[in-house]
């Protein structure tokens, strides 16, 4: 079975949330933030699923902006 790596840019405002900061103690407020995942689904479909709430990471659902294909295209499919 093929798997795909994907990288999603998160809005920088995610850093305002205490729960996020507690899970990411080295996060510097105002810096770029990314979510990295893998799936049997192609990245665009998986991003849409995150945004719709299907098996979604709560930060991606709320703060996901866009896929960053230049970070993962060269590795796919795994």
Locate the predicted segments by residue:
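Aromatic/basic micro-patches that form nucleic-acid/chromatin recognition or nuclease catalytic surfaces
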Residues: 41-44, 48-78
């Amino acid at each position: 079975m093929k798997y795909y790596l994907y990288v999603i840019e998160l809005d920088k405002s995610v850093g305002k949330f205490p729960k996020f900061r507690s899970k990411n103690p080295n996060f510097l407020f105002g810096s770029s933030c990314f979510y990295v995942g893998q799936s049997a689904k192609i990245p665009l479909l998986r991003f849409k699923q995150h945004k719709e709430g299907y098996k979604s990471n709560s930060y991606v659902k709320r703060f996901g902006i866009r896929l960053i294909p230049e970070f993962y295209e060269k590795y796919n499919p795994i």
